[in-house]
Amino acid sequence: MMNLSAAANGRDEFPPYVVPSNAAAPPPSLLPTMEQQQESSIHREHHQLLGYNLEANSLALLPPSNAAAAHHHTTFAGGHSPHDILHFYTPPPSAASHYLAAAAGNPYSHLVSAPGTTFHQTSSSYYPPAAAAQAAPEYYFPTLVSSAEENMASFAATQLGLNLGYRTYFPPRGGYTYGHHPPRCQAEGCKADLSSAKRYHRRHKVCEHHSKAPVVVTAGGLHQRFCQQCSRFHLLDEFDDAKKSCRKRLADHNRRRRKSKPSDADAGDKKRAHANKAAAAKDKAESSSKNMDIGDGLGAQILGSALLSKEQDQTMDLGEVVKEAVDPKGKASMQQHYGFPFHSSSAGSCFPQTQAVSSDTTSNIGQVQEPSLGFHHQHHQHSNILQLGQAMFDLDFDH
């Protein structure tokens, strides 16, 4: 952008240049000639050296005035300062009317000065009054977009519904595009608007009143009723009394919902099967408990037998210890069995003694042995016989 404050200071430093009255006016044009472009580039470089900030396109957009053209030709010849290049001419009435018509529909027309207005009128709201009053060049901005194009763009935006982040490609809810009408009740003479009705009523195009009415006159003058199962109108002959569903669909509905009652024979068979199943489960439980009792008793019996046999073995080991007391002269000897003392005598009296010992031993064995265990009984009898044989052998050997 142009440095307006610098331009204003430049005008204060250098007096304005007066254009001679006999200067030939060049033909008006919107674009500068080649000579003017070369001279403007020289002046632009000079202004950049002096501290002015001019855009490259600022001179190309605004054509120079007659005074500026004369100034371009006399700047270097007369020695005047080149700072008066901001003078522009007022366009002809035809061009002014064209730009005024184009700027009429421009929303930013209040920022653009009309041809013939001063810089102070358009820049007073942006710059201080002192600086705006000192800058007096006249210029204008051409409208880049016409009002017709802008109106067309706004119309297209409203039709497309492009509203900055909102998906409005389709019309809003409740609205209908061109050629479409809101759903209405299909009953004869009923034009109820179903836009705000329930989705069910909008879908089947029936209002709430006619969906429950017993008789509805539809198109063609037919007396019908709305079926709640089929969601459409049927003739009155297809309904039973005041039912709201037709006969066919109501029968299907009842068959699905209701369950048939079982017969007496089926109930008896089911009861017997249940009783048999319960009895079998009970027998199985009793047999398992009985087997457990037998196993527990057998284990206890085996454990008791083992303990008893251990005690008997210890007793027999002690009873097998035989103490013999022999007389030094060899006349008499005495054998002592554990708990069974007897004296030796002649050979004739040996058998009764053996019989006495046998009877005593048998009685002792009967006292300590349990009669229910045959195996242990045979074992102890065999050991007793061996003990008796040993005693008889000792007696015979002594005599």
UniProtKB/Swiss-Prot annotation:
Zinc finger (SBP-type): 182-260
Annotated positions binding Zn(2+) 2: C227, C230, H234, C246
Keyword Transferase: no
Subcellular location, principal: nucleus
Expression (tissue specificity): Leaf ligular region, blade and sheath.
GO CC terms of this entry: nucleus
Disordered: region residues: 1-28, 250-292
One Pfam family named in its UniProt record: SBP
Positions with a binding annotation for Zn(2+) 1: C185, C190, C207, H210
GO molecular function annotations of the record: DNA binding; zinc ion binding
Bias-annotated ranges (Basic and acidic residues): 261-270
Membrane-spanning residues: none
Keywords (A to Z) from UniProt: Developmental protein, Metal-binding, Nucleus, Zinc, Zinc-finger
Subcellular location: Nucleus
Short motif Bipartite nuclear localization signal, span: 243-259
Composition-biased stretches (Low complexity): 15-24
InterPro entries the UniProt entry points to: SBP-like, SBP_dom, SBP_sf
Domain of life: Eukaryota
Domain remarks in the Swiss-Prot or TrEMBL record: The SBP-type zinc finger is required for the binding to DNA.
Function: Involved in the formation of ligules and auricles during leaf organogenesis.
Listed name of the protein: Protein LIGULELESS 1
